[in-house]
């Protein structure tokens, strides 16, 4: 690197970008700097590197040309775990910016740095190399995987970790590196092959045995804590090793099989620690040791992917309560917050929706892969998941989720939505969810998530629909306007175009929730029509009877608003006439609920003469309505009687034509049959009134 002495005397405004870069590196290479100054210099360097890509496109030389191997050593040296957190954080951003700006040359220099440090093999060099690898893994996973999978590297970690004299910082840095590496499938497989045995040894170490064995080997050894601790793994190191093992057990490598420890070296016992044992270790750590909360939560986040662990954790009331408290106190967007949310998401997750054909195909594949022995895990069935959801809810999770939703990231919001979605599957919990703020949470999350996050937004909308199906809108929307729920609900009326299978349940639930909202006031009805009428109308033609019925029920409530009824069915347009035909046809459907919903809509619509004119103009119009009067259902007979009474009550030409058409279609006989079948005073009264008018017509 060129020296900075020649440029130090110039003011920063007159320096070229290359000279500014050299000057910053000169400052970073000097010792004895205050942390604030180091952070500031790293920040300035990061800014220069971030700007470099755009400026080089305009023809300016890149500042990476003056960044040599020594400079790279300087930047990544600040990733050392022994550096203050603020310095490490800024160095991480700077390293990321450098790798982006330098491209392949940057990756080459970083690779050379890593291999050089590992080859030196001093404790200090190991610490820095391992810290760099763990930090850049999320930034450059391909590069870091290549470094860790270098021939001989992972096997060399065993002798290092089994040394008689332990360096806690080396061990911590090494385990942090392996922890990060487990995000990658190939690395996870290699760690399982080369590292699982000594990881087991660390986790299984008994401190008392370590002291006894050491004294037996060397009776003259000083057995005070200070000396012995250098010969055994610290509690923190054991906990980190347990987390790595949990990741290996929870997400086994494809070729590792289900026989942990099968790659054991001669004389080394096979791995025996199960995921359930690791889980118990993490829960004990969570409850008894506040100093290792982050480690315990990270371990449980992976361990709780397994069904047995889910069951044990859900039944452990003390641990559940502690997890809720941990989430409550976790900083927004922190790893601790994300880890705790992941645990609750795992505990409450239902199996994904599958068609019958998909279920059969999945069973056949599982049967073939397991040689005819594999059965579905009963602990993951809906009954067990529902019970876990109940226990999680009773632990007080909802108010905490509501609080964290205000400051959540996209990832944490997605997990939060997933948890509420699962809890809302249980109808008995929906009212309490609404009371505790779940409706506000879901509306806020749906609004906050970018449109590109379609899946979590649809999940939030469906959870909202479920809660609103089972609750009174007047009680739910005391602080939040109920119009805020309309856009999320209408967004899932149309089935997900990106889904592999056509799932109509969200459509059905959205229609039911909107029907509930439409029962409240005309403003809400108008908002629903403006937001989604075309989508609602399309569902009338659904081949799924429950969906088409739900659409008619919604329309039945929407037309309670005179303004909406006239705008949709009474403006005399061709579209309005066609809509009348469709509702008439649905009043003649085979399904009783569909006929009932269509009859309810017509009972409101026939208050308008233009709609009556449209009905009587249809040859099948009057007969369909009279069939309602003859129906075996008292409710349908009531609807039919109201419709007929409305039609004949109109004055002028419309009423006269309606009376004539109905009488010609057999209205007197139909209403006579209706009154004989009915027991309800309301039905009998309206039928008698209608008959009196029609008999006068005759």
Positions of predicted regions on the chain:
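Acidic, Ser/Thr- and Gly/Pro-rich intrinsically disordered linkers and low-complexity segments
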Residues: 28-29, 204-234, 276, 327-336, ...
């Amino acid at each position: 690197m060129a020296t900075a002495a020649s440029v130090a005397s110039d003011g920063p405004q007159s320096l070229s970008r290359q000279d500014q870069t050299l000057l910053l590196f000169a400052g970073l290479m000097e010792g004895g700097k205050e942390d604030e100054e180091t952070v500031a210099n790293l920040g300035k360097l990061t800014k220069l590197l971030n700007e470099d890509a755009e400026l080089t496109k305009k023809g300016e030389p890149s500042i990476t040309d003056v960044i040599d191997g020594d400079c790279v050593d300087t930047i990544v040296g600040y990733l050392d775990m022994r550096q203050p957190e603020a310095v490490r954080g800024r160095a991480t951003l700077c390293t990321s910016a450098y790798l982006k700006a330098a491209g392949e040359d940057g990756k080459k220099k970083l690779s050379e740095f890593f291999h050089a440090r590992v080859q030196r093999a001093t404790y200090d060099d190991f610490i820095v190399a391992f810290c760099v690898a763990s930090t850049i893994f999320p930034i450059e996973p391909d590069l870091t995987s290549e470094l860790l999978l270098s021939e001989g590297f992972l096997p060399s970690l065993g002798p290092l970790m089994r040394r008689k004299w332990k360096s806690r910082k080396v061990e911590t840095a090494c385990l942090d590196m392996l922890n990060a590496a487990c995000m990658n499938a190939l690395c996870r497989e290699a760690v399982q092959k080369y590292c699982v045995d000594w990881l087991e040894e660390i986790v299984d170490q008994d401190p008392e045995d370590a002291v006894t064995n050491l004294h037996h080997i060397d009776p003259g050894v000083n057995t005070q804590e200070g000396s012995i601790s250098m010969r055994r793994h610290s509690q923190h190191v054991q906990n980190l090793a347990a987390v790595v093992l949990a990741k290996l057990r929870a997400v086994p490598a494809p070729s590792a099989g289900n026989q942990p420890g099968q790659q054991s070296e001669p004389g080394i016992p096979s791995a025996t620690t199960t995921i359930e044992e690791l889980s118990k270790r993490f829960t004990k750590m969570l409850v008894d040791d506040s100093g290792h909360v982050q480690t315990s939560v990270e371990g449980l986040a992976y361990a709780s992917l397994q069904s047995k662990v889910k069951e044990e954790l859900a039944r452990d009331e003390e641990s559940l309560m502690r997890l809720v408290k941990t989430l409550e106190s976790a900083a927004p967007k922190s790893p601790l917050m994300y880890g705790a949310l992941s645990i609750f998401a795992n505990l409450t997750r239902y199996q994904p929706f599958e068609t019958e054909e998909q279920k059969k195909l999945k069973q056949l594949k599982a049967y073939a892969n397991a040689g005819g022995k594999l059965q579905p895990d009963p602990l993951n069935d809906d009954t067990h998941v529902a019970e876990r959801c109940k226990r999680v809810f009773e632990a007080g999770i909802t108010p905490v989720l509501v609080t964290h939703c205000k400051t959540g990231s996209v990832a944490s919001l997605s997990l939060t939505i997933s948890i509420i979605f699962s809890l809302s599957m249980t109808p008995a919990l929906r009212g309490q969810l609404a009371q505790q703020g779940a409706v506000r949470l879901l509306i806020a999350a749906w609004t906050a998530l970018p449109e590109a996050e379609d899946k979590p937004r649809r999940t939030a909308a469906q959870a909202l629909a479920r809660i609103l199906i089972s609750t009174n809108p007047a009680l739910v929307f005391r602080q939040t306007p109920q119009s805020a729920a309309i856009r999320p609900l209408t967004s899932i009326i149309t089935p997900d175009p990106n889904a592999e299978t056509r799932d109509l349940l969200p459509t059905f639930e959205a229609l039911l929730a909107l029907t509930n909202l439409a029962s409240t006031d005309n403003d809400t009805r108008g908002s629903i029509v403006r937001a989604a009428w075309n989508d609602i109308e399309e569902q009338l033609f659904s081949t799924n009877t429950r969906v088409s019925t739900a659409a008619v029920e919604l329309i039945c409530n929407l037309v309670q608003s005179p303004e909406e009824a006239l705008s949709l069915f009474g403006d005399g347009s061709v579209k309005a006439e066609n809509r009348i035909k469709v509702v008439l046809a649905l009043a003649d459907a085979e399904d009783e609920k569909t006929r009932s919903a269509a009859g309810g809509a017509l009972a409101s619509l026939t208050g308008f003469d233009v709609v009556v004119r449209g009905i009587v103009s249809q040859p099948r119009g009057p007969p369909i309505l009279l069939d309602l009067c003859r129906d075996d259902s008292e409710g349908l007979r009531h609807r039919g009687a109201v419709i007929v009474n409305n039609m004949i009550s109109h004055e002028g030409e419309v009423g006269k034509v309606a009376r004539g058409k109905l009488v010609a279609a057999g209205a007197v006989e139909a209403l006579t049959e209706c009154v004989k079948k009915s027991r309800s005073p309301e039905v009998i009264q309206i039928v008698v009134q209608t008959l009196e008018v029609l008999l006068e017509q005759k």
